[in-house]
């Protein structure tokens, strides 16, 4: 079986990381998988880039300009809205024509347009689409932030100036997606049960096939290491508790840095000795902009996977207070290294963290509870038992083998359904 995974980027962003890991999982379990991207970042021969042209850059810039115009030239929500009006026709590429299954991943920001997806469907090839956020099920947003207008027809979008109108951009794109999905059979996959529930509530997904399969992780790469050696490689203190925060852009409001800072402030007020025995490591872009009441280490953005694994293994606790998230790769990476995680009860996070078994699930936006969770992991819990529970959870749910088998089943069903329809 030949599978072509289509994603905007090869490595940048959580969806790209997940798509890359899925490709590896499939290739290690009997499937011939390749990845087609716009932004190729390595020399990996299983990853193919779109033919280089000025058109690729134009597609990206033109769509961002259109979004900028619809936002009345405000940058505030510029990266929260996608229209899929610009893209590249991939159906003539050799990799497309050789594939048995076309697997769409995160295809926004000028990679594929809705017209391009319609052409993919019309090619007759089975199409599987993994949802890394809610965008395929809404008009224009990736995360609904409590809005449920996508249950019917979108419109009056809270992301648009003055909350849009009944027939605004979100309503128009919603209708285009509805026509697209109605005309073609797509097998949708969500990475979390939370996202599956959200998607099933969409007016776009009435009668659609939706399966829940988590993202995989290579447990031969993300695995426990000696903490003292890991800290030496990461340049972190050997004699402190270390709390880790990781995000591609740590100042991203959705990742909850404000709540992390407030929780740390509460901990320091409650336990002043933490100033002497605890440090914080922050991994990700803009980490130097964060000010904390505990000694902190700004690790900036790191691309070297071995260094990232060393940083995880340096930590005693990993904290991700996301306000909305699907199935965060960072929590999976932390757990695969045997490091317990603390996060809010939101999105797919409670599916990953089993409360007080392999980490701590705090009440949503409750920084007092978040602080209690951090302290519980550092000072009260059985650390060895937590570590073992983390490793067991990952092995049972997120291993390459377990995830690959589930996707192979989806591919076989999609091919059988397509043949039946023909």
Mark where each language-model region is.
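Conserved donor-binding/catalytic core segment of Leloir-type glycosyltransferases
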Residues: 237-255, 261-264
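Nucleotide-activated donor-binding/catalytic signature segment of Leloir-type glycosyltransferases, i.e.
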Residues: 275-278, 284-309
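Conserved acidic donor-binding segment of nucleotide-sugar-dependent glycosyltransferases
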Residues: 355-356, 360-367, 376-381
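A short, well-ordered alpha-helix in the C-terminal region of glycosyltransferases
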Residues: 382-397, 406-409, 413
